[in-house]
Amino acid sequence: MHCPFCRHADTQVVDSRVSEDGATIRRRRRCPACDKRFTTYERVELALPSVVKKDGSRTEFDRRKIVASMQLALRKRPVAADAIEAAVARIEYQLLGSGEREVRSERLGELVMNELRALDTIAYVRFASVYRRFEDVSEFEDVIEEFRRASSPPKPSRKR
């Protein structure tokens, strides 16, 4: 790898560490020519499907957009950045596992909502209100009622 400081063609790896999720390798490098150190990150590049938008246009999958939209929904919520990264990684693995070359933006939105639902209910409602274009309070009430039904324990049967 070229040194970013002096452009020397060969650098030495001083230290390598695998990230907690095992998806990235962090390498500390040193240039023998200028003796400066720098860090590189190595990640497997996989071919994620293209995203088909509502208008039919196609765009490349952009991890940063998913992270940004989740961060916006989770703004001022007690969720760690690592949890967001892990959620985005799960979305990517689901897309890769599908084997599809294209994914509809609606499906991608549903995957994001599922991850937000598991992370933080407030963030889920925030995202859903924008994604599903809520127009009145009753739509918020419907989502909240879904949560109430899902979180309440089933009633015991009255069989004797």
Curated annotation (Swiss-Prot):
It holds the Pfam family Zn_ribbon_NrdR. Disulfide bonds: none annotated. Residues 49-139 form the ATP-cone domain. It comes from the Bacteria. Keywords: ATP-binding, DNA-binding, Metal-binding, Nucleotide-binding, Repressor, Transcription, Transcription regulation, Zinc, Zinc-finger. GO terms for biological process: negative regulation of DNA-templated transcription. A zinc finger (unnamed) spans 3-34. Its cofactor is Zn(2+). One of its GO terms (molecular function) is ATP binding. The keyword Transport does not apply. Binds 1 zinc ion. Negatively regulates transcription of bacterial ribonucleotide reductase nrd genes and operons by binding to NrdR-boxes. PANTHER family: TRANSCRIPTIONAL REPRESSOR NRDR. HAMAP family: NrdR (MF_00440). Belongs to the NrdR family. This is Transcriptional repressor NrdR. It comes from Paraburkholderia xenovorans (strain LB400). The lineage of its organism: Bacteria, Pseudomonadati, Pseudomonadota, Betaproteobacteria, Burkholderiales.
